[in-house]
């Protein structure tokens, strides 16, 4: 039997060992490599040198001995799609940077924009330390890299987490320019397809067993700032708690933009808050199934918006006369409870961040968490968070549980016959000041949290118009605030704007026009949404002259009576209850019938 040798093959996914013989041909060896890495026979290239010289081809009949490949040698594997330079990839990554991931993934616009930016921190000449002319540079004024920790720590306030794109620049820096950079998602599951043993719980091996996880503070964050466009967006959301005392939940709709206060930073700008069906009490929230969720996302997309996060209240009134609230979330209690961390992780897994540097095509998430809670001054504050990628993996693979009696603690599940769970550790300091490693049973959730600054602009921004008598928000029937044509008629009659675009530019009104059961406009509202998105009054006037809006005006007049100035959207007055009690709506076809009739004039069905 020929003497066996072991050849190491390095790929973007790591190094694997291939057992071969000295007399084995190159073609036979490449078949083993293809099987080990899961490639097609022509889906990769293997080179003797890292600089892609000395390619081993399948057409060669030479043995490994003749190719001077010895026991323990390291060969280099490159997938075919990455074997040569790609102009498409080079347009979206820093110069000289070759990646091993999913080059066909379409990243978000903000990611494409930031990947083309220089990102360096330029400094002016220091009059005291610089000893050179105005055109020279020295260590005191040379531009800094966006990931410079000393610079970030000396900002006011200090930045604990560099931006995600600064982190990418750090990985792609150095002599090798990040030649083998690949952002791999953590997996807590047993790898499938291992044929060397029985499936779990009857067998496991080092090939399919997931690695143990040691929780570390994540050095970067995918979003660096949350900004509400104006105070009205947040105040209308808080009105529910002010009127009921119950906690409330909402989805943040907005867009991702550049955050210029941090090198290569990303900001989540919130333009509107959608409130799904829910049951809230003073200390709990229960989300109900939302049949309109997909429609809301579609309408938001046509308005140039997307779901960027979620928000909930945790408010307890302390002194109703002073209007103060209890300061309950701090370093002595918790910032996010374990249940909230798990919920945030689930949301982030449902909204992954598209990334070309990851073999999976996604890495982390830009989905943010906002909490309306009491601050140190006993006033309402908005706090922003995300959970780490490690937390996302633990939640995705169902390895993390909340603790019932301690909201600040989570619990890593133990392995069972149904599920293998890798060991999860975290580092702590004992009473002697020594660093120790603890098993995450239980686990302080502060190891999973990334804080994000939450702000309001000095100069408010208004994607949607602000009215003194706004259209009711959806799913607030418990307050007596319903979305129907009576409330629409009232809104139109009380609106003081003479510009139709300003009147119709209300996120909740647009959702009602699309989702109402009497006359949904999902197929005919695209022109109006485009007018709102581009702030084009001419397009809005064109849509106003359509049959659909004429029908809506007729319904409003019928339901709310003859409202003076309905078509001008500027007059106030008229009784809105004149005809409501007299006319009746058919339960079968919703046609408004005249009083005194027992059958519907449209469908001829009985009234009851």
From Swiss-Prot:
Q: Does the keyword Endoplasmic reticulum apply?
A: yes
Pfam family membership, one: UN_NPL4
Its source organism is: Homo sapiens
Its keywords, alphabetically, are:
Acetylation, Chaperone, Cytoplasm, Endoplasmic reticulum, Metal-binding, Nucleus, Ubl conjugation pathway, Zinc, Zinc-finger
PROSITE patterns, A to Z: MPN, ZF_RANBP2_1, ZF_RANBP2_2
Q: Spell out the protein name for this chain.
A: Nuclear protein localization protein 4 homolog
Q: In which tissues is it expressed?
A: Expressed at highest levels in brain, heart, skeletal muscle, kidney and fetal liver.
The record's principal subcellular location, in a coarse class, is cytoplasm
Q: Which residues carry this modification: N-acetylalanine?
A: 2
Tell what the record comments on domains: Binds ubiquitinated proteins via its RanBP2-type zinc finger.
Q: What does this protein do?
A: The ternary complex containing UFD1, VCP and NPLOC4 binds ubiquitinated proteins and is necessary for the export of misfolded proteins from the ER to the cytoplasm, where they are degraded by the proteasome. The NPLOC4-UFD1-VCP complex regulates spindle disassembly at the end of mitosis and is necessary for the formation of a closed nuclear envelope. Acts as a negative regulator of type I interferon production via the complex formed with VCP and UFD1, which binds to RIGI and recruits RNF125 to promote ubiquitination and degradation of RIGI.
Matches recorded under Gene3D superfamilies: Cytidine Deaminase, domain 2, Phosphatidylinositol 3-kinase Catalytic Subunit, Chain A, domain 1, Zn-finger domain of Sec23/24
Q: Which domain of life is it from?
A: Eukaryota
